Each structure stands twice: as C-alpha cells, then as structure tokens.
Amino acid sequence: MDYPDRFDVIVIGGGHAGTEAALAAARMGCQTLLLTHNIETLGQMSCNPAIGGIGKSHLVKEIDALGGAMAHATDLGGIQFRVLNARKGPAVRATRAQADRVRYKAAIRGMLENQPNLTLFQQAADDLIVENDTVRGVVTQTGIRVFGESVVLCTGTFLGGVIHIGLDHHAGGRAGDPPSNALAQRLRALPFHVDRLKTGTPPRLDAKSVDFSVLETQPGDDPTPVMSYLGRRDQHPRQVACHIAHTNARTHEIIHANLDRSPMYSGVIGGVGPRYCPSIEDKVNRFADKSSHQIFVEPEGLDTHELYPNGISTSLPFDVQFEVVRSIKGFENAHITRPGYAIEYDFFDPRDLKHSLETKFIHNLFFAGQINGTTGYEEAAAQGLLAGLNAARRAQGQDAWSPRRDEAYLGVLVDDLITMGTQEPYRMFTSRAEHRLLLREDNADLRLTEIGRELGLVDDTRWAHFSTKREAIARETERLRETWVQPSSELAKRLSGKLDKPLAREYRLADLLKRPELNHADLADDAPELDPAVAEQVQIQAKYQGYIARQQDEIDRLRRHEALRLPEDLDYARIDGLSHEIRQKLEAARPETLAQAGRISGVTPAAVSLLLVHLKKRRLIEDQDVQAVNA
C-alpha cells in the first residue's frame, strides 16, 4: 500500500545522525518522517556512554549553536562533566560528559515526540524508490511505499552488519538488533563505491563484582561545566566518579596466546577498524613495548550497576574475554554482563557526496553518519543536522548550505570526507582544523547561531539568549576600550602586585587585558556583574586579538579560491598540461570549488593554476576573479 501522507523529508534511522536530521528538517517547517526499526532505541548510545572530548565537543557545541539536540540531552543525562586540556589554550579545551544511557535516550525521544512537523514510524526501510536518478521515496519491510521530496540515510552500522565474537559470527546491526541487508543490497546496486569498516565494544561488567578500592578515582569538575549554551547546572542529575584500571603483563600474555582465535587476526574480518579507538588485541600487538594500558571504568547510568570498561574493546571469544577481565587488578572477581564484540558493516565512499551531503549520482538522496565512514556519536550527529537541513532546503526549492573550513569543525569534517575520502573510521580532532584558534568550543554560538536563525533552525528562546550574550560582549568590549587607568589610581595600585613593574603611564583596560598576568576579573571592579561566558569571551578575544587577526587575513586569501566554483560538467580531459593521474583524481572527486580541488591528495599547485587558466580561456570566470586569486 501507499502511505496516506506525503512528506517533504524522510529520514531513515533513529541514531545520533537520524535524530538530528529529522529534528533539523522539522524545525525548518518541513513535514518530516523518521523511520526507525524500533522506536524504543531512538537516540541509543550503542558504544561508550559519553559525549564530547577533544575535537568532539567542538562539534557538539556547533550542533547546539544551530539548535540541535545533543548538547541539551547531555545536560539532562550527564552524570559527570570535565573540561579536558583546561590548562592549555582555549582552542583545544574540550568538555566531556559521562552520560546515563537511559536518561540521554529519554531526553532525545522527548524532543522528537514533542517536535512539531515530525512523525515517528516504526518500520525498517528495505528499498528506495528511484526514478530518473532522483529518489522519490522509501519502501518499508512490510511493503508500505512512502513518498517524499528528499530522503536522508542514517543507517549506522546496520548495512550488511555482521557481529563477531571470536570465530563465531552472525548477522546484526548491533547487539540485539537485526541488520538492514535488503537496503544494503539495494544501495550496492546503485552507482556508489562501497567498502567495509569495523568497530567494536568491550565486555560490560557488574559494578557489584568490582573492587573499586584498588582503582584510581577520577572525579568530575567542580563547578560542573554545562554542554549546551542554554544549559544550567541544575538540569544535571546526580554526579558520580569514574575510575581507572590498567592491563598488565598477564593480560597481554593471555591476548597474545589467543590471537589465532581473533577474527581480526585470523582474516575473518576484512574491514578496517578505528585507528584512535583500537581493540585491546590491536593495542597489545601494535604497542608490544608497553607493559600496561589504561582502562577508564565508566558507569552506564545512575539506576544500573553495569560498567563500561573503556579501553578493552575486543572480539576475542568469550572464554578469553573472561580470562582477560579477571587478570586485571580490581576485576579479579568481575562478572561480565555482556560480552564484547566487533561489528563489520558497509560504508560508502564520501567522495560520492557534495558538500551538502547529497549524493552526486542520485538527486535528493543524502547520507549522514557511519554510512560515510565516520566514527563517533558527535561526528554522526553533526552530519545528520547538515544533511537534514539540506534535505529540507532541497524540498523547499532552496540552495544548499554548508559551513566552510574556517567557519566550523562541521565544515572541516565534511570537506575532509568529500575531498579525501577515508580508508578507516574518521574521527574529529582539533589538529584537523587549520584555523582552530577561531573554531573554539566557547564561540560556536558566535560563529553559527545567526546563520542558524537565517536557516530557520534556531527558535526564539535560543535567539533571545544569544542576542543578549552578544550585546553584553559588545558592551563590555567597548567599556574596556574606553576606560583608561591612571598610574595613580587605586586600580593601578592593586594591579601592581600582579605586574612585573607598576604602570608608568595611563593604559586602556583593553590593552591591560592583553597582558598574560591579568584576567578579566582583575579589571572588572567598577563594572556590572557579567555572565561568566561573556567575561570569558571578552578575555579570549582581547588576549588572542593579534593571532586571530593574522588567521583571519589568511582565511580571506583562501576564500578567493573558495569563491571560484568549478562547473559540474567540466571535462578534465580537455585541460592541457594535466597529468593522467591528476585528471583521474579530479574526475573521480568532481570538486565543487578551486580550493577543494587543491586539497585533493596529489593535485599540485601547478595543476590548480592550469585549472585557473582553463576557466579563464572558457570565460567561465571573470578576469578580475583570476586577478583576485593571484593577488
């Protein structure tokens, strides 16, 4: 049968990518359908119960700045919050939260069920309706045909998913859930490049059987950070500690003796695993000189005794897992509640996507999350939001939007994927961003909320909060610029204790704040009390003003390349001087801009210059554009 309603946007998958995609499209006014094989697992944290971390919290804050759900759900479900790299510069500071799985999932489901324009439907998707290279809808497992203007695929690890425990394996999207094999076969029949990746999870432990007295305690921060720009500490549930354990020589002996029973080392698994979250087998094998590896013992929630031992992800047989766990100090009597496993799944080469995450071969079809070769809740959620908003814009007849690399980590993530592709699960790090001094987690709202408002993603409450904050920053910045301190003033006398030498002349407060010895609180005696987030922003902008200005100049030069778009039908075979190899790379990637072409591995600056000359010859760009690029 045909579903009685037609939708603007259909989202397949209810994980972190799918939920953000559906919420984004619905916030923009599109009639949106979220298809999931099980409504009870919406927003499920399939791997570790944590949100944020280095590079990842930057994405979470950007999602939040654009009106997304992840940060708010984290504030409602977070049971431990910490700021990582707190003693380093603001560009690399990152908030990380341990989350209660049940509370987090409930928060996401609550937002979905209360979002206007959004319909939830428990049905697995088995097929796509494609006509004239354009997706028209979806066919469910029970044969229901649902029609829509745009479709977003957020299938996670479910496409052709195979779960491995030792040399035994079975089909599955994750533990306890079936795979999406019919949809995987349908996608393989379309002109996409497909490959396999793998990820894994550790055995879960019963806290009642763990000896915490011999483990290192890892408390959260006090005062507790918040994840959302609208977050409040009183939203947080009860806070708890995590703990740290360590593997040892005996643990490593057990693993080495059983590598022939590992599906990874016996050739059963062909997919590549995440480099930055390796299995314990990988760690012991690759880092044979290390006598010990850390294990972060993370509580799964406030109402359960289950623990997540982060650091011993494994696909070894259960009897070996049992020995490994019992060999660890503090785990000598530990009871395993669920065995660890590896899962192998299909992913599609993200170079087959545009910046909007729409596929190049099938119009109105968008991919987001692990289907694009990424790993991590945060990376998936960020892609989901972008794909959802662009699916909505496509349905509304509007042009696509995507942030540039200098505007957001989301821009870095997408540009890396669609330009270079990935041979292993892609994880975000601050080191991937060239302009990370501008892309801090503390200023994601200043970078993106105004854009989000224009796109229709940001509601009145968030906009009012943001506007108040932005105005307060401007007022305080102006006060610091206009206020002068005389050497004989009381403030100057108080500051002399913090400075190398007393002030010898008058200074503006703004100039004093640039000094490393002083912070905003030292200069705020006569000012109205400021929100800490406002004071932090004023201080960072003052202290890093010179560095930020230099980085902005560099960005302005790069933007000239970004502005030069390459025609979709550009025939690289007709461009004189390009090597056969470079022609092949450009033809395969089909870059959208001159700057993107320059970021393709193996495409030289000389080749970019040849592209520029060719465009000028074909009068595809104006002479002044070429002059601007060469300036």
From Swiss-Prot:
GO terms for molecular function: flavin adenine dinucleotide binding. InterPro entries: FAD/NAD-bd_sf, GIDA_C_N, MnmG, MnmG-rel, MnmG-rel_CS, MnmG_C, MnmG_C_subdom, MnmG_C_subdom_sf. Keywords: Cytoplasm, FAD, Flavoprotein, NAD, tRNA processing. It comes from the Bacteria. One of its GO terms (biological process) is tRNA methylation. It is found in: Cytoplasm. GO terms for cellular component: cytosol. Gene3D superfamilies: FAD/NAD(P)-binding domain (3.50.50.60), GidA associated domain, C-terminal subdomain (1.10.150.570), tRNA uridine 5-carboxymethylaminomethyl modification enzyme MnmG/GidA (1.10.10.1800). FAD binds at G13, G14, G15, H16, A17, G18. The keyword Secreted does not apply. HAMAP family: MnmG_GidA (MF_00129). Homodimer. Heterotetramer of two MnmE and two MnmG subunits. This is tRNA uridine 5-carboxymethylaminomethyl modification enzyme MnmG.
